[in-house]
Design a protein with these regions (language model features):
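Alpha-helical transmembrane segments of integral membrane proteins
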Residues: 15-23, 290-326
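Short cytosolic juxtamembrane segments of multi-pass membrane proteins
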Residues: 197, 299-311, 505, 514, ...
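Short helix-to-coil transition segments within interhelical loops
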Residues: 191-220, 407, 501, 507-528, ...
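Membrane-water interface segments at the C-terminal ends of transmembrane alpha-helices
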Residues: 26-60, 72-190, 219-240, 244-246, ...
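Short, intrinsically disordered terminal tails adjacent to the first/last structured region
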Residues: 1-19
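Glycine-rich helix-loop "coupling/hinge" segments at transmembrane-helix boundaries
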Residues: 63-64, 141, 240-267, 354-359, ...
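Juxtamembrane inter-helical linkers in multi-pass membrane proteins
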Residues: 63, 207, 298-315, 350-365
Length: 604
């Protein structure tokens, strides 16, 4: 049947034959500002670290020149290579311990009928939210040569059968405290699998342990590989544990070598510290990129599932008690011993052999804390940076996530890679780099302004620059460093909520004429408000336990518990460290309780 055709009307609205002009897309200034500020906050500190590493003296010295003297010095220093070797051993040992144990605990918690899983699950995540500095101190006062449990065991058997100061003990403790990181990824992968193959293995006579090692864990190998790279990378970030446990026998890793450079030379050796920092980033950055590659390639694996991914807990039977013994041993060594040691030490006047606990109970350590204004400020600042700073950080993370939301362009790819960069920078190094930002940028701007021969430049130099210099001594400096260090983590929390918003809701709003800004304000943000609340509580927990980022930013007005613990430990104030650690644990416990009460998914 013939079809009729109609001529295409190519006349424009003015009646001419020209087509209407295509309107050029408008530049989104809000998005541009978010991208600019994000890139400055990420790359400016890192640039200063690289710049300082290629100077022959600290950047504020007039005789500084470009050169490789800093790298020559550290490469000729035997302590650097000892720290590097120890760092490799620590990272490797950490992965060897944490990956199989984390996978095993995930299998027991997710795939079996292990009793008590409901209350055990949050307990497994405690080491993630307790500061490593606090954990290290907990092992000293509980299992050190004169620790509580060491003296009690010595009274029973006549000697202490362990040495927490040995490097092997440090590796074991670090491995055990990083098990939850592997557990999170392994349990998430196991929850997505059906149980048909496991049931078939059980029917054929396989024990629960054979099912775990031969069926379940091999099916989540991509997740275990990702977690393995993660904990290997985290091994190079370990600072607090080695600082506390490694000092008595002189064990160094790169982070503690960096921290002790000033003490070693007697003067602030910023160029040498920067060279060590560059070496650290050179190791960690490829690991972060490898993580990203593994995460993307993991999506290509197809897991064997039953119909509807049906899951049925495997009956442990007679193996139930063995499973509980493994789980109980990990909880005892990793959580109970160090934390109870801190609680006991914070309430006793002193401790040693032959001392009876009931005779030395006291509250004096807490009185001493509240008698010192700097420590009181540290507690208040820690709460403020967790509550208010955490909320502001989530707002910033949300703005960055919205700048990437459903926009598959070059800017999104730039941000996607940029937010991973801070993850490759250990907290100690990040704090140092921000210190240099607050020292260098005002001086650099002042030099530019003084070179301009006009009244406005001179006014800015005399009035604005002094205010800019004072930022270093404010809590804002610490908040900015914290927010950048935990950028990748915060982005993951917010992005998880954004991905749950169906695109059809936003498209419907756009179809009726709503602008992109109004869609965000009236549709997207209201739908993710509970996700943002959960993100705020999680960021609060992370900010409360953070310690290494504030070490180099510590000054009157910027005291926080984490940095004060490092300072007090260096000064030998064991009593104050114990009481302050107890306060820090209490704050984390309160935040954790609130998060659980509101149903926040801690596995995020």
């Amino acid at each position: 049947m013939p079809t009729s055709t109609m001529p295409l009307d190519t006349k424009g609205a003015d009646g001419t034959g020209s087509l209407p002009a295509v309107r050029a897309p408008r530049f989104n200034w809000t998005r541009g500002l978010v991208v600019l500020l994000t890139c400055v906050a990420i790359f400016l500190p890192l640039f200063l670290v690289f710049y300082q590493s290629f100077l022959t003296a600290p950047f504020f010295m007039p005789d500084k020149m470009l050169g490789l003297d800093a790298f020559r010095f550290i490469f000729d220093d035997p302590d650097f290579w000892l720290a590097f070797k120890n760092g490799m051993l620590l990272a490797s040992g950490l992965a060897v311990i944490a990956v199989p144990l984390g996978g095993m605990l995930a299998f027991l918690m997710v795939r079996t009928d292990l009793p008590g899983r409901g209350w055990i699950a949050p307990l497994l995540l405690v080491p993630i939210f307790v500061s490593p500095m606090v954990m290290g101190f907990g092992y000293v006062v509980s299992m050190g040569p004169v620790g509580f449990y060491s003296t009690w065991v010595k009274d029973l058997v006549g000697f202490v059968p362990w040495n927490v100061y040995s490097f092997a003990s440090i590796v074991v403790i670090a491995g055990l405290t990083h098990v939850p990181h592997v557990y999170l990824y392994a349990s998430s992968a196991l929850k997505s699998l059906g149980s048909d193959v496991e049931e078939a293995a059980r029917v054929s006579g396989a024990s629960p342990w054979q099912v775990m090692f031969n069926v379940s864990l091999p099916m989540i190998m991509p997740a275990l590989a990702y977690a393995g790279v993660l904990v290997f990378f985290l091994g190079f970030e370990v600072f607090g544990l080695v600082l506390v446990l490694g000092d008595p026998e002189g064990h160094l890793v790169l982070a503690t070598y960096l921290y002790k450079l000033t003490n070693k030379l007697g003067t602030p050796s910023y160029h040498l510290m920067a060279a060590v920092a560059v070496c650290l980033v050179a190791v960690t950055m490829p690991l972060v990129m490898l993580q990203r590659r593994l995460l993307k390639s993991a999506n290509k694996y197809v897991s064997i599932k039953g119909k509807g991914a049906r899951q049925k807990p495997l009956a442990l039977g007679k193996w139930k008690w063995a499973a509980l013994a493994v789980l109980g041993a990990w909880i005892l060594v990793t959580i109970v011993l160090p934390l109870t040691g801190i609680v006991l030490r914070s309430f006793v006047e002193y401790w040693g052999e032959g001392v009876k606990l009931a005779d030395v109970l006291t509250l004096q350590h807490f009185r001493d804390i509240f008698d010192q204004p700097s420590l009181v400020r540290g507690i208040v600042n820690t709460i403020l940076i967790g509550v208010i700073g955490g909320a502001l950080a989530v707002v910033c993370y949300t703005a960055i996530a919205l700048a990437m939301h459903r926009k598959a362009d070059g800017i999104t790819r730039l941000l996607d890679y940029s937010v991973l960069v801070p993850r490759a920078v250990p907290g100690l190094l990040a704090g140092l780099s921000f210190l240099w930002v607050f020292l260098f940028v005002p001086s650099w701007l002042d030099g530019i302004l003084r070179g301009m021969d006009n009244g406005l430049a001179m006014w800015l130099s005399e009035h604005a620059i002094p205010l800019l210099r004072q930022v270093r001594s404010t809590i804002f400096a610490l908040w900015l460093a914290y927010s950048v260090v935990w950028l990748a983590y915060g982005m993951r929390l917010v992005s998880t909520s954004l991905l749950q918003v169906g695109p059809e809701l936003e498209e419907a709003a756009r179809a009726v004429g709503a602008s992109r800004g109004r869609v965000t304000r009236d549709v997207t943000l209201p739908l993710i408000k509970f996700g943002m609340l959960g993100a705020w509580l999680m960021v609060f927990l992370i900010f409360e336990r953070e310690y290494s980022t504030g070490v180099y930013l510590l000054s009157p007005g910027t005291e926080v518990i984490g940095a004060m613990l490092v300072s007090l430990w260096a000064g030998g104030s064991t009593d104050l460290v114990a009481a302050l650690s107890f306060i820090n644990i209490t704050l984390v416990a309160i935040g954790l309780g609130i998060a659980l009460r509101f149903g926040v998914k801690l596995h995020n």
